[in-house]
């Protein structure tokens, strides 16, 4: 630590505290402000758009200072946290009246992006996720907690950085902690990340924190169930939270292991390509997610993050949806749900000591809706709905307690009192009555003094500095009674006090202090009573979230004309009249649905051809989105859907330069393709859109053909869109490959897209017609037509002969070139060898 002896005692104190929190902003309490100094002040001034001033000097230079009012600090802190930064709150803990030198101060709380519970700091529809990554021997152990949910989840051991990146980005955490300084420096996740000291990832410390933080039975179960490296990862979260909270995180009540084999896996690129859960209005989440509560919205996002392949869970969800659809029963349930607040986060705030009086009113009002909700659920007497209903606890005693204790519109905090309802506590009422009756005393006292002095202009008043006083004009100085004691002199008047008024003042001020202290004690006792219902409220919140999501699915099923999917074990995917929800939602004309059939017995690979804008990409995306919806338990946009077991969805759609990594469009495309080829299996759904277009025609064709052949050999269900019409010949070589194309009709030099998938290969690409639709000028179009004519006339024979030779087309005449082609066995040569032969023939 630097020499601080040349600073003032106050700055010395600040620097000592700051040295323990070097990487985060220190909010240092001074009176009614939180002040920041040095670099913290500069950063805060820029982030918060507040004035940067100066205080004193350091080494001859002014010390930068910026501050925010204490009463408005929450809004400023929220801005900082939402930018991914952390804050240490340093409060005055000593008594200014007894302190020698600076008042004692301590950091009472640390606020980080993932460890906030206040409503102002949180997105109500987004889980606040803290991820811990323990790297050891080239393996990654990962655990995460949804802070206000009170649970820790352990993920399977990850063996590659790419696998780790996909897992982390799928969780979309607000904050990451790790033992790896290298990982923190690289930060491939582009999320707030910090490398912690080694002791956070000590196995000994981990077991200690597990024992200290969790219920004894849960702790013993965890210690027996998981291996040391897994325990270290769990313990790192508990130790980090303990340090942040300055207390044991008692709100963590559950730890569970996520079973990957029960999940439909979708990597981050595929999620982006399919527009599953981004913030755009055209994302699948924005169309499907119409939950009535924040609880339901967050649970739906978890469904989107982890689609389940557990058929029992999916059957339960589908059965509940069917029950709620009957007579549109979901409408009544959604009406009740709309009155329920975020009780999960409210009870977490109670446990964490950050709850506000208005939260308790919201909790009471929400709990009052539970009897109505339970009655509505009981009307659907199915085992699945009954199971949910049994986990919703009707907490009438707590409702009564909160109703009696808290006024209807309480102030923002308990700091100045005024929260507890009259009649709840006799002692508090008596203390308040002294203040309430003070007005009558002052009126009578003032009238008595007027009579006694004969001065009609005499006034009795009060201010916070001097207290109660009697005010008289200076012209009446000769009439002042001897018992009047001068308290304050003004320009035109004098203020006095009497022993009687002083006694009254002491009584009033004493009663105020006692009333406030009493009210705070009652409030703390009330919170202790509320926390006794923690587990019941958490379980109730989880059940409300579940019924909210399923009622939402029921409403969406009716509104969007969705149907219940079936599941089979026949390796067959049969879909009829499939629609793309986002496109259907955003166009005025009727959407053209399409059928899809993929089966190991007929075809696993579809080569899809047709013009741009014809519907190829939409067709592929809608199949992937339908599979995804089926595996989150929703109904699907099709008239019929029979789905086999799909464990992963891969997509290669579109590309752009990755400038930050120095990778070209083609390199990005090939990297993503390599990942899919290396990981796809017979249980994968693969979407490939225009592979090979980022390089020369021959290279692109060779690569596209090789990739398509590989997918055919793997047996992955593959939708392969291409402009290389030569690939349609693969259907003659592989029994599990078929061709489909999207039709277009020409009329008077115009093109009309049918958007209908038809068996067979396309005959034409319609590129010039599409260019016309895009607004290319007529002179350019005419030039393009002439160029096309010349190319077809001059190069058709040579190029078509070379390319078609790869697909074993019959020769039309016998010459040396054709004899050479006849001698080639294309079933045994590689694409590279084929290209070499083509170049050799071209030289001839």
From Swiss-Prot:
BP GO annotations: mismatch repair
Binding residue positions for ATP: 610-617
Alphabetical UniProt keywords: ATP-binding, DNA damage, DNA repair, DNA-binding, Nucleotide-binding
Keyword DNA repair: yes
InterPro entries (alphabetical): DNA_mismatch_repair_MutS, DNA_mismatch_repair_MutS-lik_N, DNA_mismatch_repair_MutS/MSH, DNA_mismatch_repair_MutS_C, DNA_mismatch_repair_MutS_clamp, DNA_mismatch_repair_MutS_core, DNA_mismatch_repair_MutS_N, DNA_mismatch_repair_MutS_sf
Record carries keyword ATP-binding: yes
SMART domains: MUTSac, MUTSd
Sample GO molecular function, one term: ATP binding
Origin superkingdom: Bacteria
One Gene Ontology CC term in the entry: cytosol
Physiological role: This protein is involved in the repair of mismatches in DNA. It is possible that it carries out the mismatch recognition step. This protein has a weak ATPase activity.
Family: Belongs to the DNA mismatch repair MutS family.
PANTHER family tied to this protein: DNA MISMATCH REPAIR PROTEIN MSH1, MITOCHONDRIAL, DNA MISMATCH REPAIR PROTEIN MUTS FAMILY MEMBER
Protein name: DNA mismatch repair protein MutS
Organism, as annotated: Francisella tularensis subsp. novicida (strain U112)
Phylogenetic placement of the source organism: Bacteria, Pseudomonadati, Pseudomonadota, Gammaproteobacteria, Thiotrichales
């Amino acid at each position: 630590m630097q020499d601080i002896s040349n600073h003032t005692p106050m700055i010395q104190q600040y620097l000592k505290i700051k040295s323990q929190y070097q990487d985060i902003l220190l909010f240092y309490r001074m009176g009614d402000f939180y002040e920041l100094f040095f670099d913290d002040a500069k950063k805060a001034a820029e982030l918060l758009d507040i004035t940067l001033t100066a205080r004193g000097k350091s080494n001859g230079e002014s010390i930068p200072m910026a501050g925010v009012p204490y009463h408005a600090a929450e809004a400023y802190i929220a801005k900082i946290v939402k930018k991914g930064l952390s804050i240490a709150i340093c409060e005055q803990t000593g008594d200014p009246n007894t302190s020698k030198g600076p008042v004692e101060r301590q950091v009472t709380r640390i606020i980080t992006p993932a460890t906030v519970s206040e409503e102002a700091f949180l997105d109500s529809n987004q889980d606040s996720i803290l991820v811990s990554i323990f790297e050891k021997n080239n393996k990654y152990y990962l655990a995460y907690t949804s802070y206000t949910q009170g649970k820790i989840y352990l993920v399977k051991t990850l063996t590659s950085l790419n696998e780790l990146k996909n897992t982390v980005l799928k969780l979309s955490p607000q904050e990451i902690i790790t033992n790896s300084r290298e990982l923190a420096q690289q930060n491939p996740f582009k999320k707030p990340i910090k490398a912690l000291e080694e002791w956070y990832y000590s196995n000994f410390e981990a077991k200690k924190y597990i024992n200290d933080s969790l219920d004894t039975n849960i702790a013993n179960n965890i210690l027996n169930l998981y291996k040391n490296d897994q325990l270290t990862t769990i313990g790192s979260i508990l130790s980090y939270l303990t340090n942040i909270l300055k207390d044991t995180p008692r709100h963590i009540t559950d730890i569970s292991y996520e079973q990957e084999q029960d999940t439909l896996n979708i990597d981050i690129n595929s999620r982006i390509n399919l527009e599953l859960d981004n913030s755009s209005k055209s994302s699948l989440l924005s169309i499907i997610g119409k939950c009535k509560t924040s609880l339901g919205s967050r649970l739906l996002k978890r469904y989107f993050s982890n689609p389940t392949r557990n058929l029992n869970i999916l059957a339960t969800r589908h059965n509940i949806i069917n029950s709620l659809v009957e007579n549109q029963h979901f409408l009544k349930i959604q009406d009740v749900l709309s009155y329920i607040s975020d009780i999960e986060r409210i009870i977490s705030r109670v446990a964490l000591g950050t709850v506000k009086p208005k939260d308790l009113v919201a909790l009471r009002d929400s709990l009052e809706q539970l009897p109505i909700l339970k009655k509505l659920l009981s009307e659907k007497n199915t085992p699945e709905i009954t199971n949910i209903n049994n986990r919703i606890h009707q907490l009438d005693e707590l409702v009564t307690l909160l109703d009696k204790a808290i006024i209807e519109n309480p102030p923002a905090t308990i700091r100045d009192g005024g929260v507890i309802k009259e009649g709840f506590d006799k002692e508090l009422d008596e203390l308040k009555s002294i203040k309430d009756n003070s007005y009558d005393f002052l009126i009578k006292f003032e009238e008595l003094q007027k009579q006694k002095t004969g001065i009609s202009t005499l006034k009795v008043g009060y201010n916070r500095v001097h207290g109660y006083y009697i005010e008289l004009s200076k012209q009446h100085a000769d009439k002042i009674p001897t018992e009047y004691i001068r308290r304050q002199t003004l320009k035109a008047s004098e203020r006095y006090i009497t022993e009687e008024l002083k006694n009254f003042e002491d009584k009033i001020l004493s009663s105020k202090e006692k009333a406030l202290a009493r009210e705070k004690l009652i409030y703390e006792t009330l919170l202790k009573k509320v926390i006794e219902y923690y587990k019941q409220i958490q379980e109730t919140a989880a059940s409300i979230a579940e019924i909210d999501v399923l009622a939402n699915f029921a409403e969406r099923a009716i509104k969007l004309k969705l149907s219940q999917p079936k599941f089979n074990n026949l390796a067959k995917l049969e879909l009829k009249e499939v629609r793309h929800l986002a496109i259907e939602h955003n166009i005025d004309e009727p959407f053209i649905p399409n059928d899809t059939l993929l089966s190991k017995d007929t075809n696993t690979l579809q080569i899809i051809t047709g013009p741009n804008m014809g519907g190829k990409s939409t067709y592929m995306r809608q199949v992937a989105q339908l599979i995804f919806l089926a595996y989150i338990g929703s109904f699907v946009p099709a008239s019929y859907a029979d789905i086999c077991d799909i464990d992963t969805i891969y997509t290669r759609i579109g590309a752009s330069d990755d400038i930050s990594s120095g990778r070209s469009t083609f390199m990005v495309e090939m990297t993503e393709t390599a990942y899919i080829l290396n990981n796809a299996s017979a249980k994968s759904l693969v979407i490939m859109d225009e592979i090979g277009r980022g390089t020369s025609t021959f290279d692109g064709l060779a690569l596209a053909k090789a990739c398509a052949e590989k997918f055919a050999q793997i047996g992955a269900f593959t939708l392969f869109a291409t402009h290389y019409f030569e690939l349609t010949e693969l259907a003659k070589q592989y029994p599990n490959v078929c061709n489909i194309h999207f039709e277009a009709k020409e009329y008077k030099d115009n093109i009309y897209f049918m958007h209908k998938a038809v068996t067979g290969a396309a005959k034409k690409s319609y590129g010039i017609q599409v260019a016309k639709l895009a607004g290319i000028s007529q002179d350019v179009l005419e030039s393009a037509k002439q160029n096309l004519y010349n190319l077809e006339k001059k190069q058709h024979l040579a190029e078509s002969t070379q390319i078609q030779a790869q697909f074993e087309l019959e020769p039309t005449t016998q010459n040396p070139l054709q004899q050479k082609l006849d001698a080639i066995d294309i079933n045994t040569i590689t694409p590279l060898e084929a290209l070499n032969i083509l170049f050799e023939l071209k030289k001839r």
